[in-house]
């Protein structure tokens, strides 16, 4: 786990997202948590099959609970998913854009940077840019993205956090809309992750749903995951199943 932390620290230092800090009234601790992929089933001590997420690696996280407890909560809302999907499903051509390292594109004011201080086996650091783990990070990011694209939303693009869905009723219409969105990204220094972008497609997965001119469908991968789940044997298993089934039911 120490190497996981070392690798992440060196990466963040290299790009200037964090910097060493000598002292702070706010110090949070680092942890490593498993990164999980798909779902498999494994036998328990009673030889019953139970669902289990596949661990694909580990990542560094910071426990900001102490800071979050003292933070005044920002209740800025996220967009209504069903309304977004309804708008998108009425179109035939799409560009799906992805923001690069989402939260880290938001700078933190100098006086507040020391509040993000964290300690690890090497030394103590603070963030210049917004890290994951802060209770107001999602609201702050959504507010920023909405402000950037406020005059485009519900017209040529739908914005959910760092997922930007550009749409149009024809090839030329969608291409023109993309040009306007990319110009806005350049004007505001918003960086995109081209490797995760999909250009000029007739359908795509948005927030776990497949959208196209045919309408809104559930992502088949979600259905397959439920079909592979064994019959729940206890309360934990029932909750897990209901969580997955509720997603389908809400669709």
Regions found by a protein language model. Name each.
Residues 1-251:
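Retroelement reverse transcriptase polymerase core
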């Amino acid at each position: 786990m120490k190497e996981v932390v070392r690798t992440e620290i060196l990466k963040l230092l290299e790009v200037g997202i964090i910097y060493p800090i000598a002292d702070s009234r706010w110090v949070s601790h680092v942890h490593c948590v498993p990164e999980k992929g798909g779902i498999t089933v494994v036998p328990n001590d009673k030889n019953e099959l139970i669902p289990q997420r596949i661990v694909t690696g580990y990542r560094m996280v910071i426990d900001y609970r102490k800071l979050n407890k003292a933070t005044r909560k920002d209740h800025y809302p996220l967009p209504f998913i069903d309304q977004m999907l309804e708008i998108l499903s009425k179109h035939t051509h799409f560009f799906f854009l992805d923001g690069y390292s989402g939260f880290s594109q938001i700078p933190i004011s100098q006086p507040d940077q020391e509040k993000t201080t964290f300690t690890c086996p090497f030394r103590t650091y603070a963030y210049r840019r917004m890290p994951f783990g802060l209770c107001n990070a999602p609201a702050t990011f959504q507010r920023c993205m909405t402000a950037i694209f406020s005059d485009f939303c519900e017209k040529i693009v739908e914005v959910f956090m760092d997922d930007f869905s550009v749409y149009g009723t024809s090839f030329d219409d969608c291409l023109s809309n993309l040009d306007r969105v990319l110009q806005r990204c350049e004007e505001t220094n918003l960086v995109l992750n081209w490797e995760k972008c999909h250009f000029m497609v007739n359908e795509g997965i948005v927030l776990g749903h497949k959208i196209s001119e045919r309408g809104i469908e559930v992502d088949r991968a979600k259905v397959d995951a439920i079909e592979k789940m064994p019959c729940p044997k206890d309360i934990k298993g029932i909750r897990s199943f209901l969580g997955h089934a509720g997603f389908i039911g809400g669709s």
